[in-house]
């Protein structure tokens, strides 16, 4: 018996509204069976013409004595049909599937793509491989001793079982809008790259995850750079491809800067070492163990209460809260908030937090961590942690996969994710929301203000290392409605040129996305 595999159709990946993000295209595999060939010259002539191949390459395979020789895979179906219609003995045209991405580069670093064998390589394609892959079928044909098929015995078929479909929380319209917004700010600010995350802070569903520049999923082995890549070695090329495929929202860490003051604020309020009415004085710096740590405003903010300190994003205020907490307590909240373990997002290669060891953390380290410097976290970790601090204190798992559907689209299994209740009290969570609403209404985040709806948020501008290079990461984290958040957005701009303040360049990006959500009346994201 001779066996030929029939590939199973891979399951589709769908967005929240059922739009197809990853699909299959029928392609053909052309093979020759040596023992059945009657007119080799005709076969060589037809195949070289139709497949646009060198006759010699085909001759080698046609003349090779073997049970079956593949000539070409991934042949367009129309070409396969033409070849089949010649009725050439010894030529087999088998139909097969190739992955196809209708939206090109949309959410490329989330969806991922498949290799030549149709197996997932990165992204959701590899994370949900077992669900999507299906089971191959086979064709068994009976042959005589010379390997010639005995026609009258026919063939036995085991039909392939198609893969199941994965429904995700991604929203194509939101993803497209956010990707355009990211491209726009990247071009305007001549930035190196821009990431945007949009998620539901109540349940962890991710609506959009943008990392520009993205790449074309239908052509994932072509670099997305303008530079001439002709002179690269194979290793350099592979390194650049790996870099292009990375998802910086979870594969890479960064120094968050002032968006991290939300964590210090929540810990200080929960522990009771600070209240909203506490007064602080900022002369433009704070002395910690004989070291002068500056405020962004060198002339100082003068006298202010805690809410004003947050509105001004004043470093000395948050250093003071960090020092009042002390290393042991600060570390306790770090653990309690889930910052020292990974978020568990359903994509491969999530990076962990890079933090000072507790025993190496002195007052100076504590002071810098309190306002978001001297350590690194992933954007997804920041978004998930802040979500958990503003939703009433429930630690959620950020995720894309929502349910697994049968290939015919029928019944599905809902995917479940862990959540941990009570990482802070409802009361502290409410105070954090109120303070962050003030930051947008009257403080450093006012460029995210929207008429008619309360938005909460926090800006950040951090210098990358070495500090002397004067390169910055500008970001803004916002959520709405402030009193009962249904959507949280994080925009991170790497290495912007010119004006680099997060409140000036990143806050308007989140505002434009929030306005887009509000204007799309058919979307009920923001109303519970």
Regions inferred by a protein language model and the residue ranges of each:
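Short, glycine-anchored, charge-dense loop/turn motifs used at functional sites
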Residues: 6, 13-22, 178, 196-207
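Juxtamembrane extramembrane loops of integral membrane proteins
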Residues: 4-52
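Short, gly/Ser/Thr-rich active-site loops of penicillin-recognizing serine hydrolases
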Residues: 410-415, 507-528
């Amino acid at each position: 018996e001779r066996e030929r595999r029939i590939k199973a159709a891979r399951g589709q990946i769908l967005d929240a509204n059922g739009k197809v993000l990853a699909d299959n295209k029928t392609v053909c595999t052309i093979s020759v069976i040596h023992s059945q060939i009657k007119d080799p010259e005709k076969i060589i002539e037809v195949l070289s013409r139709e497949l646009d191949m060198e006759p010699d390459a085909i001759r080698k395979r046609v003349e090779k004595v073997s049970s079956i020789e593949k000539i070409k895979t991934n042949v367009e179906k129309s070409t396969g049909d033409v070849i089949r219609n010649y009725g050439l003995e010894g030529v087999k045209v088998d139909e097969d599937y190739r992955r196809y991405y209708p939206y090109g580069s949309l959410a490329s670093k989330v969806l991922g793509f498949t290799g030549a064998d149709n197996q997932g390589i990165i992204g959701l394609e590899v994370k949900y491989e077992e669900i999507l892959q299906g089971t191959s079928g086979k064709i068994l044909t009976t042959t005589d001793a010379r390997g010639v098929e005995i026609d009258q015995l026919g063939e036995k078929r085991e039909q392939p079982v198609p893969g199941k479909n994965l429904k995700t929380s991604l929203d194509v319209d939101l993803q497209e809008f956010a990707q355009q917004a990211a491209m726009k700010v990247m071009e305007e600010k001549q930035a190196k790259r821009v990431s945007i995350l949009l998620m539901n802070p109540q349940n962890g569903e991710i609506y959009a995850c943008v990392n520009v520049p993205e790449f074309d999923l239908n052509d994932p082995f072509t670099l997305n750079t303008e530079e001439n890549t002709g002179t690269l070695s194979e290793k350099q090329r592979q390194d650049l491809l790996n870099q292009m495929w990375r998802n910086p929202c979870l594969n890479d860490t960064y120094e968050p800067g002032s968006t991290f003051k939300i964590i210090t604020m929540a810990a200080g309020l929960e522990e009771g070492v600070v209240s909203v009415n506490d007064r602080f004085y900022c002369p433009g710096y704070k002395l910690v163990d004989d070291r002068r740590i500056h405020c962004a405003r060198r002339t100082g903010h003068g006298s202010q209460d805690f809410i004003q300190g947050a509105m001004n994003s004043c470093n000395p205020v948050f250093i003071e809260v960090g020092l009042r907490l002390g290393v042991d307590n600060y570390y306790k909240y770090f653990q309690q908030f889930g910052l020292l373990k990974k978020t568990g997002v359903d994509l491969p290669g999530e990076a962990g937090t890079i933090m000072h060891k507790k025993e190496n953390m002195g007052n100076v380290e504590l002071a810098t961590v309190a306002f978001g410097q001297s350590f690194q976290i992933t954007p997804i970790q920041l978004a998930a942690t802040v979500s958990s601090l503003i939703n009433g204190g429930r630690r959620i798992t950020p995720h894309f996969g929502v349910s697994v559907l049968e290939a015919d689209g029928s019944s599905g299994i809902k995917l479940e994710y862990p959540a941990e209740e009570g990482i802070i009290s409802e009361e502290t969570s409410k105070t954090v929301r109120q303070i962050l609403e003030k930051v947008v209404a009257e403080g450093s985040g006012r460029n995210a203000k929207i008429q008619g709806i309360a938005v909460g948020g926090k800006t950040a501008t951090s210098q990358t290392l070495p500090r002397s290079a004067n390169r910055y990461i500008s970001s803004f984290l916002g959520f709405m409605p402030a009193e009962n958040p249904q959507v949280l957005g994080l925009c991170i701009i790497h290495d912007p040129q010119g004006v680099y303040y997060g409140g000036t360049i990143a806050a308007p990006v989140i505002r434009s996305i929030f306005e887009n959500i509000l204007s799309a009346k058919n979307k009920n994201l923001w109303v519970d």
